[in-house]
Amino acid sequence: MPLTYRSTLTQFLIEERRRFPNASGDFNALILDVALACRAIARAVALGELGGAMGNHAAETGGSVNVQGETQKKLDVLSNEVFIRRTEWAGNLAGMASEEMELPYQIPQQYPRGKYMLVFDPLDGSSNIDVNVCVGSIFSVLRAPQDALDSGRDLNEADFLQAGRQQVAAGYAVYGPSTLLVLTVGNGVNGFTLDPNLGEFMLTHPKMQIPPETHEFAINASNSRFWQAPVKRYVDECLAGQTGPRGKDFNMRWIASMVAEAHRILMRGGVFMYPRDNKDPAKPGRLRLLYEANPVGMLMEQAGGRASTGELPMLDVQPTSLHQRIGLVFGSKNEVERIERYHAEPVQAEPSNPLFAERSLFRS
C-alpha cells in the first residue's frame, strides 16, 4: 500500500493557531486532551464485554440513574470519568458540565484553572451499547466569564448558559468500524480518523460540506401519533414519494444515536428531527440544548447545513437551565428551511385529529 502523508490533529491545530498570533496554546492543548479522552473511550467501547464494562452501572444494587432520570450504563459512567480525568489537570479549564452530572464540575484546587469551559455528553446513544451499534461522544467549548477568571471563584450554572453562537469549538467522536473525530473551531468542519497503529487522529475528511438537497430523513416514527401538524405534513410528503407533492422518493433512517445520525448527514446529507410532541407535554423536547443541540448546530452551520428549533436558528436560543431540553431539526439546508416554513404557515385544525391544533412543536 503506498504511503499517504496526512496531517495529524496536532499539525492541523498548529496551522489553525497561526491565524491568531497572540494565542497562548491553551485551546490547542484542551482539544488534544479531549481527543485523548475520545481515544480512551474508543478503546473501552471496542473491548466491549471483554473489558467488563457492559451492562447497567451498579446493577447489583438496582442500578443508577443520572440527572435526566435515565438508567446509566457502565460505559456512561466510565466515559464521564475519562472526560474529567483527561481534561481537568492541565490548567486549560475553569470548569465542566456533563449530561451525567447534575451540577457543574469544579476543577480541583490542586490544579490550575484556565479560561475555557467544556460541556459534553460523554457517551451518546448508550442504549445501543449492548447490541453493538454505533455510539459517540459530543462536546462544546465555551469561554468562562471574565469575572470568574478575575476572582478565581467557582463556576455556577449561570456561567454555562451561553447561546450557541458563543461556542469557541464543537465536535464529536463516533465509535464505529473506525473511530472518527469531527471538529469545528469556527473555520469549517474537518474529520480525523484514528490510526490504531500510530495512535494519532489523522486528517481524512477536510472541509466537510453537507449537500443542500437530500432524499433521506431520520425521525422516530413510533412517536407519529404524538406529532403535531408541521412535522406530520413533512413526513407524509416524504413518504408519499414520487407520486406525492415532493415528486421524489425518500428513505427513512433511525439509529437512536444523535452523533451517528449527525455523522451520516455530514457525510452524505439528510435531515434529522427530534421534535417536541404531545407525548409528554412537560418536556419541551428530548435532546439537551447545551451539550447536544448546540454543538451539532455549530457543526451543521459550519458545514453549510442548518440547525433549528423550527422557529429560529438553534444557535440563537438563549439557554435557561443547564440540562434544558429542546426540539431539534438539523441537516441539509433546503430541507430544514422547508420544515421551518411549515411551522410558520398557519395550520387548520382537523376535527378528527386534535393533535394538529397547535402550530409548532420545536419550541424551547
UniProtKB/Swiss-Prot annotation:
Binding locations of substrate: 124-127, 220
GO biological process entries: fructose 1,6-bisphosphate metabolic process; fructose 6-phosphate metabolic process; fructose metabolic process; gluconeogenesis; sucrose biosynthetic process
A GO term from the CC aspect: cytosol
Keyword Metal-binding among record annotations: yes
Assigned EC number: 3.1.3.11
Keywords: Carbohydrate metabolism, Cytoplasm, Hydrolase, Magnesium, Metal-binding
Superkingdom of this protein's organism: Bacteria
Protein's recorded name: Fructose-1,6-bisphosphatase class 1 1
Higher taxonomy: Bacteria, Pseudomonadati, Pseudomonadota, Betaproteobacteria, Burkholderiales
Gene: fbp1
